[in-house]
C-alpha cells in the first residue's frame, strides 16, 4: 500500500466547475440583490420601530419576534433582472456590486426601490461595457491598418539645376553676364550648356 493514498484521504475530490461564467455572475449579482433587499427591509423595520417608540414612549421590541421578510420580487421582474445579469461580463461583476452598494449607502432607498436601483446600475454597467467595446474595436482597427513608413515616401522630383521655361526680361540680361565667381564653401550649380 502506498503512502500517497494515505495522505490524500482527507482532500476534497477535485472537480471542475460545470457552471459557466455567466451563470456565476448571475448567481452572484442576484445574491447581492437579495441580501441588499433584506438589509433595506431590516433598516426600514428599525426606522418604523424607532418612530413607534418615540410616539408611544414604550419599547416592546423585546417582546415581538422578528417578522419574516414581506417583500419579494415578482417572477417577471426577477426574470427580467436575471436576463440583464447574464449579459454582464465577469470582469464587470465586482464594479457593478461596488456601485450598487455605493448608491444604496447614498440614497437609503425603501425595499421596493432597491430592485429599480439595481436595474439602473446594471444598465449603467452595460453602457460602459458597450463604450469600452467600441473603443477597443476602434483601437484594433487602427492597429491593424497598414501604415506607411517615412522610408517608403519617395520624392517625385529631384533637386537639380534646371533651365526655366518661362522667359523673363532679367534672364536676357543674366545670359550675357559671366557667372559670378563662387566661394569655395558653396557648391557650384550650373545649368548644362547647350552646344
From Swiss-Prot:
The lineage of its organism: Eukaryota, Metazoa, Chordata, Craniata, Vertebrata. This is Protein RD3. GO terms for biological process: negative regulation of guanylate cyclase activity; protein transport; retina development in camera-type eye; visual perception. The keyword 4Fe-4S does not apply. It is found in: Cell projection, Cilium, Photoreceptor outer segment; Photoreceptor inner segment; Endosome; Nucleus. Changing residue 68 to W: Less effective in suppressing GUCY2D activity induced by GCAPA. The keyword Phosphoprotein does not apply. Plays a critical role in the regulation of enzymes involved in nucleotide cycle in photoreceptors. Inhibits the basal catalytic activity and the GCAP-stimulated activity of GUCY2D and GUCY2F, two retinal guanylyl cyclases involved in the production of cGMP in photoreceptors. Involved in the transport of GUCY2D and GUCY2F to their target sites in the photoreceptor outer segment. Up-regulates the activity of GUK1, a kinase that also plays an essential role for recycling GMP and indirectly, cGMP. Plays an important role for the survival of rods and cones in the retina. Changing residue 23 to D: In an individual with an atypical late-onset form of retinitis pigmentosa. It comes from the Eukaryota. One of its GO terms (cellular component) is rod photoreceptor outer segment. Keywords: Cell projection, Coiled coil, Cytoplasm, Endosome, Leber congenital amaurosis, Nucleus, Sensory transduction, Vision. InterPro entries: RD3. Its main location: other. It comes from Homo sapiens (Human). Expressed in retina. Widely expressed (at protein level). In the retina the strongest immunoreactivity is detected in the inner half of the cytoplasmic portion of the photoreceptor layer, where rods and cones are found, and the external half of the outer plexiform layer (at protein level). Residues 23-52 form a coiled coil. Residues 170-195 are annotated as: Disordered. Monomer. Interacts with GUCY2D; negatively regulates its activity. The interaction with GUCY2D promotes the exit of GUCY2D from the endoplasmic reticulum and its trafficking to the photoreceptor outer segments. Interacts with GUCY2F. The interaction with GUCY2F negatively regulates GUCY2F activity. The interaction with GUCY2F promotes the exit of GUCY2F from the endoplasmic reticulum and its trafficking to the photoreceptor outer segments. Interacts with GUK1; up-regulates GUK1 activity. Changing residue 57 to V: In an individual with cone-rod degeneration; abolishes protein expression; less effective in suppressing GUCY2D activity by GCAPA. It is linked to Leber congenital amaurosis 12: A severe dystrophy of the retina, typically becoming evident in the first years of life. Visual function is usually poor and often accompanied by nystagmus, sluggish or near-absent pupillary responses, photophobia, high hyperopia and keratoconus. The gene is RD3. It holds the Pfam family RD3.
